[in-house]
């Protein structure tokens, strides 16, 4: 039987526990989350336990990364279920601060990353990546783990985090973990719970569109021809709108046309009120 995860709610308590582990010579992995945990999140914890002696997960629904018309109010919050899931995954510590702990009165600092945060989700969700970068910077400095783990499903987010960690000399290894998928290929996401059964049946067309573009690139086609066809296909399949489908350089996220280097195909589309994102890599 797994031991129940220990829960702390203050930065001081988090630092005290991590400091005690450090005194024992133990290494620490951090998995930042917004809760509503699924198997994808738990795969990050399990990978963290392969890379370090102790695993810390944070659960904080970060208000600064939601736009004014987004789903902050209805984003699922289920701490008891999350704590049970983390316990079963072998996580040692859950950091679950409230908003006042993370953003005390007078808080006035924002971390913004130019370049990799431009375009894609950055164009559709202005301010989103500044909110992500600020809260993740805080979490990394609060915990100072040896390694922090993030899912590749949020590929642009991962690129933003890698960039600011490098630029700001934050001494933490940033580890990307491959996307976990449902049996029909849909990327696991806390927001999948928003979908009706009818929408859920349409959702796998997103990964099919991405794999179709990958096949086309391998056959020598250009992104400028493939991406508009994929958008049309998603709308025909029943998606309400497509924010973007783009082919980018896997490292820099600069726009790319042909398969002459490692690329990433990224998409965001909407089914009703649910916004789905996904991406896959393709190698020459």
From Swiss-Prot:
Q: What's the catalysed reaction?
A: (R)-pantoate + beta-alanine + ATP = (R)-pantothenate + AMP + diphosphate + H(+)
**Residues at which ATP binds:** 34-41, 151-154, 180, 188-191
Q: Which UniProt keywords apply?
A: ATP-binding, Cytoplasm, Ligase, Nucleotide-binding, Pantothenate biosynthesis
* Active site, per annotation: 41 (proton donor)
Q: Do the record's keywords include Cell inner membrane?
A: no
Enumerate the residues binding beta-alanine. 65
The family database entries (InterPro entries) matched by this protein are listed as: Cyt_trans-like, Pantoate_ligase, Pantoate_ligase_C, Rossmann-like_a/b/a_fold
Localized where?
A: Cytoplasm
EC nos: 6.3.2.1
Question: Which top EC class applies here?
Answer: ligase
Q: Source organism's superkingdom?
A: Bacteria
Q: Please list the residues that bind (R)-pantoate.
A: 65, 157
GO BP: any one term: pantothenate biosynthetic process
What CDD domains does its record include? PanC
Name the protein family. Belongs to the pantothenate synthetase family.
Listed under subunit, the entry gives: Homodimer.
Q: What is this protein called?
A: Pantothenate synthetase
> Organism source for this protein?
Paramagnetospirillum magneticum (strain ATCC 700264 / AMB-1)
């Amino acid at each position: 039987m797994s031991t129940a995860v220990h829960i702390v709610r203050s930065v001081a308590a988090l630092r005290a526990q991590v400091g005690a582990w450090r005194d024992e010579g133990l290494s620490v992995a951090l998995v930042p989350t917004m809760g509503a945990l699924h198997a994808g999140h738990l795969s990050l914890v399990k990978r963290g336990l392969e890379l370090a002696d102790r695993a810390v997960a944070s659960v904080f629904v970060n208000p600064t990364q939601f736009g004014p018309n987004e789903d902050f109010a209805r984003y699922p919050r289920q701490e008891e279920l999350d704590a049970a899931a983390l316990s079963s995954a072998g996580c040692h510590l859950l950091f679950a601060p409230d908003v006042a702990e993370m953003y005390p009165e007078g808080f006035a600092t924002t971390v913004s990353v130019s370049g990799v945060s431009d375009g894609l989700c950055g164009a559709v969700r202005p301010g989103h990546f500044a909110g992500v970068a600020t809260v993740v910077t805080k979490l990394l400095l609060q915990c100072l783990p040896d390694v922090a783990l993030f899912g590749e499903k949020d590929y642009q987010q991962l690129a933003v985090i890698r960039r600011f960690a490098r630029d700001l000399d934050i001494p933490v290894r940033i580890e990307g973990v491959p996307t976990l998928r449902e049996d029909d290929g849909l990327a696991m996401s806390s927001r999948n719970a928003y979908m009706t059964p009818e929408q859920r049946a349409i959702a796998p067309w997103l990964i099919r569109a991405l794999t179709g573009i990958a096949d086309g690139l391998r056959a020598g086609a250009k992104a400028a021809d493939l991406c508009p066809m994929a958008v049309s296909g998603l709308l025909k399949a029943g998606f309400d709108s497509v924010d973007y489908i783009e082919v980018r350089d896997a490292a820099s996220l600069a726009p790319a046309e042909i398969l002459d280097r490692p690329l990433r195909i990224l998409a965001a589309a909407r089914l009703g009120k649910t916004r789905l994102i996904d991406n896959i890599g393709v190698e020459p």
